[in-house]
Each structure stands twice: as structure tokens, then as C-alpha cells.
Amino acid sequence: MTDGKYVYCIVDSAEHITLEDVGLLGKPAHVIGHRDIGAVVSPVPYAEIEASIDNILAHQRMVEASRKIGTTLPVKFGTIFKREDGVTTLLTKSYEDYRRKLTKLEGMDEFGVKVLFNKAGLAKVKSAVEQTSPDVVKMRRSLAKAGEGKSYFTKLKMNEAIRSEAYRKMDELSREIHDDLVRNSQESSILKSEHEQIVLNAAYLVRRGDGDAFLARAGRLGKEFAEKGLLVHSSGPWAPYSFC
């Protein structure tokens, strides 16, 4: 089968560099240049690449390794061209867009922050809601006075109100965390999450010299909001996946 060119990322260098780190299928990667930008590629069979954990991690490792060259724009997993001239055409047609993004993201890192809760955290938030929500307090008083038949439905209504208010409160708390981190970053992006327990999944663009301070701030927020039932998990620095 003919080998194609698998593209990992765009870099702000056209120098023909071979990276020591290996990419997909254990093959070394190199730079195909155009003007003052380049694409980091490696040879792979010209066929659809399976989105397996190993392949995705190999893609991510090469993107991170490419940052040694300079500013990096990650390319979507699975991007393959049949021949080298296909990569050159991509660089030629998209040059202005790539150049603008490379300039914007120079000296920047991406950090990820997830805010989530576990059973203990949810119980803590629910307990706070039961004590502070005027509606819940009112229903609890009504429950104490209600007869057996009415009390059953009142209790169901109260439990649903507690649950709804607890989730609203967690959203409110996660927004406080997000707003704080926004003030400590250059740009932010809210990301999708498929897990109900994750109430915030966000990426933040941070100047490279400010990365340690950003992680320290996220750590302090984690300690502060753990008392309120939320867990804060931070990661990075990464290439700016969410901003290019």
C-alpha cells in the first residue's frame, strides 16, 4: 500500500527538521515547509487511521514534541494526504490563516480545568440547599404539618426542589471558578462534556511565563471550593488545541 503523509500540526518554521520523537506506527516525523511555516508529518499507509487510544496518544505526543520547534497549531486527528504536494497545497491555500493564528498564539500555552462533583460533594451541596433555600425551608415546614397522604407528595416535591436547586448551585459555583480563571488568562473556551458529574470543562490560554501562577491559582480554588462540594482538576501546559 502506498504511504501517505499524516499531518500532526502546523509550526512557525519552514526548516526541514526531522524529529527524534516517533509518531504513528513508530515512524519519525519531519517538517514540510512553505514560506515561513511548515507542517509536521510522518509516513503512514494511505488509508483511514483508526481512532484508537494508542493512535490518539501518538498524535498528541507528536504535537507536544513539535512545540520544541516553535508555536504549534494542532491539526485534527486523522488528517492524511496522498502525496507531499497535497500538504504543500494546504499550506499555500491556508497560509494567511495559519500565519495569523501562529502570530496570535506565540508564547501561549493552553491549560485545561474541569470542575466536577462526586456523591459526597453532591450531598454537601444538597445539605447547604436544605438549610438556605427559602422554598425548601417552606416546604419542610409544610411537610411537618401535612397529613399522611399530602406529606408523600410534598416530600417528593421537596426532594425534586432540593435536587434542582443543588444543580443550579453547582453551576453557580463553577461559574465563580471560571470567572476567576478568566481574569488570570488571555482567552477561554467552554468545552463540551458528556459526563453529568462535570459541571465545567474549560480551556484557558495563558502566557507562557504565567503558567505556574495560573496552576497555583487553580489549586487554591480547588481547596476553597472543595469545602463547598466541588473538585477542581487542572492540566497543562498543552499546545493550544482549543484556540486554533
Give residue ranges: language-model regions.
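An interfacial alpha-helical scaffold signature
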Residues: 1-244
